[in-house]
């Protein structure tokens, strides 16, 4: 597969890695298979990335930058607590649905047998998302003078667990059960429960 000189080789390698994660669910990706997919030698891969772990770090960097930059936009543009929570969870679910291979990284499935540092990086991304959810829920008390009957940290953890569960179902179903399926109806129920608390 010839790559146009205009395409950044590093980006092309990462795109191929994400595609392979999508098209080979449950399988481990070797550098030999990746090199064949990219159309270069393994040595050429290592000219752009010193290790396979660095390739996964490149995907994790993309995940973090994509999600957190959009979360910051939600935080800036939307002031309603429930709408912020909904948009943040939808962002995570839509991002996963549009990037099935990357969902395997988020879920940890693609990182089995890889460097522990990679799983820690993904955990850190989820911790940052949970922190944003806590902040959103705590700001409701400050803005409206009325909070929730349950600690905001517990609620934030529950909301994130719902999204993570949907991503896990998506990966487990080999990308057939979409993370966004029924989310709108589920959110109505979740919101009612949150507002009653």
Swiss-Prot record:
GO molecular function: sequence-specific DNA binding
Domain of life: Bacteria
Keyword vocabulary terms for this entry: Cell cycle, Cell division, Cytoplasm, DNA-binding
Subcellular localization: Cytoplasm, Nucleoid
Predominant location: cytoplasm
Functional description taken from the UniProt entry: Required for nucleoid occlusion (NO) phenomenon, which prevents Z-ring formation and cell division over the nucleoid. Acts as a DNA-associated cell division inhibitor that binds simultaneously chromosomal DNA and FtsZ, and disrupts the assembly of FtsZ polymers. SlmA-DNA-binding sequences (SBS) are dispersed on non-Ter regions of the chromosome, preventing FtsZ polymerization at these regions.
Family: Belongs to the nucleoid occlusion factor SlmA family.
Subunit structure: Homodimer. Interacts with FtsZ.
This protein's name: Nucleoid occlusion factor SlmA
Annotated source species: Shewanella sediminis (strain HAW-EB3)
